């Protein structure tokens, strides 16, 4: 029997040395897979099957969960934290948040919860607000120019020429315009007997005496001040706005603000309906009517998705179409702009649609939209760059 010659089949073997993961596009290569079920990346770069499903615990009304030295679950309005340490008892905080879906992120020992803007501390099990608000309700607020130590001054006299025989430590207000002796053009001076000369005392700060404010704010916080009669009184034109707290005093705050106006050298006491300015020598007064109470706030933006990258919490707001970053290591300050590397950061994006997620990958903060990916580069606000 004679058989026809058959073409010999060549044997070949192809090795995949790099696993590319999931690729749902049309250009899926041999080192990738377009879809999969029951796979796991725990043995990366090798692809393995997942572990069998098992029941860990039963939860009702779950709105979010996050693991940081333990598992935090948000069930309805309650927070339940189960530490990883053996024998540690779970911590429950009832009525801590509103009932709704949450975005959570961890930094340090704290887990931040949005949109409620609260932080759960895994170290002591406490819940605290990220923002803070102080408002004058039935109490008066005092505004006075002060030095870098928070000290306010009183003078016994003023004029164009200093006294001929001053006492040691005597204060004198040297004026440039006698018709406006309390204006910012005048200079507060103090006499020193040891040197025999007068020294200028700069009053570049404002001491805000407001009972309870010292418990809500901390040093270097950025506080938004509203409702003051400072501009109306002719003391400061920029007291209303974002100010940096340079020091927390016994019963108030010390903020930096440039003195501008014809009545800088005086004290302003403001109540719910009126305000009164008194000169440094106590001899002149002026009264004003006010309609809004004094309000001080440490603001936190409304964020839809959050992630942590390089010791900052990053978040995005679909309402404003803005990406925010908190101050370095401080998730309570989101509007701190002092011109240093630890400043907060914000950038408006030009893409359409709402944000759909946020993540940190390979040291970069990523923000997702349906058809856009925004990527943040850089290590400090001065060199942050956004690519899309």
Predicted regions and their residues:
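Short, intrinsically disordered N-terminal pre-domain segments
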Residues: 1-38, 43
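Small/polar beta-strand repeat architecture
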Residues: 4-8, 131, 183-221, 226-300
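Beta-propeller and closely related beta-pinwheel folds
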Residues: 49-59, 150-159, 297-388
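Repeated scaffold domains used in trafficking and secretory/extracellular systems
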Residues: 55-69, 94-108, 135-147, 298-308, ...
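Short loop/turn segments that connect beta-strands within the blades of beta-propeller domains
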Residues: 68, 75-77, 107-108, 114-116, ...
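Short hydrophobic/aromatic-rich beta-strand motifs
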Residues: 71-72, 109-113, 163-190, 218-226, ...
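Short, surface-exposed terminal/edge motifs of secreted or surface/virion proteins that either
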Residues: 81, 117-133, 170-202, 252-257, ...
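Extracellular/surface-exposed low-complexity repeats and stalk/linker segments enriched in Gly/Pro
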Residues: 93-99, 139-171, 175, 201-204, ...
């Amino acid at each position: 029997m004679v058989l026809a010659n058959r073409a010999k089949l060549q044997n070949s073997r192809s090795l995949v040395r790099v696993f590319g993961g999931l690729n749902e596009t049309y250009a899926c290569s041999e080192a990738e897979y377009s879809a999969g079920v029951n796979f796991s990346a725990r043995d990366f770069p090798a692809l393995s099957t997942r572990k069998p499903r098992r029941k860990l615990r039963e939860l009702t009304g779950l709105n979010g969960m996050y693991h940081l030295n333990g598992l935090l679950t948000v069930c309805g309005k309650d927070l339940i934290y189960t530490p990883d340490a053996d024998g540690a008892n779970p911590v429950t905080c009832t009525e801590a948040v509103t009932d709704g879906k949450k975005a959570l992120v961890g930094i340090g020992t704290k887990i931040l919860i949005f949109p409620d803007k609260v932080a759960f501390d895994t170290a002591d099990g406490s819940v605290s607000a990220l923002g803070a608000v102080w408002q004058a309700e039935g109490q008066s607020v005092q505004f006075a120019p002060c030095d870098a130590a928070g000290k306010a001054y009183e003078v016994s006299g003023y004029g164009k020429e200093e006294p001929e025989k001053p006492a040691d430590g005597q204060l004198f207000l040297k004026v440039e315009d006698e018709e406006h002796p309390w204006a910012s053009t005048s200079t507060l001076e103090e006499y020193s007997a040891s040197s025999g000369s007068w020294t200028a005392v700069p009053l570049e700060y404002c001491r805000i005496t407001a009972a309870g404010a010292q418990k809500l704010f901390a040093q270097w916080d950025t506080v938004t001040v509203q409702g003051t009669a400072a501009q109306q009184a002719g003391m400061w034109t920029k007291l209303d706005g974002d100010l940096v707290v340079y020091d927390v005093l016994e019963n108030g705050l010390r903020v930096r603000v440039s003195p501008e106006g014809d009545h800088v050298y005086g004290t302003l006491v403001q109540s719910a309906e009126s305000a009164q300015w008194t000169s440094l020598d106590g001899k002149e007064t002026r009264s004003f009517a006010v309609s809004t109470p004094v309000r001080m706030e440490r603001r936190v933006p409304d964020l839809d998705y959050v992630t942590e990258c390089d010791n900052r919490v990053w978040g995005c707001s679909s309402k404003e179409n803005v990406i925010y970053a908190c101050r370095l290591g401080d998730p309570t300050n989101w509007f701190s702009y002092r011109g240093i590397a630890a400043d907060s950061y914000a950038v408006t994006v030009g893409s359409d649609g709402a944000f759909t997620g946020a993540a940190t990958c390979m040291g970069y903060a990523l923000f997702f939209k349906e058809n856009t990916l925004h990527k943040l580069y850089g290590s400090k606000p001065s060199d942050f760059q956004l690519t899309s």
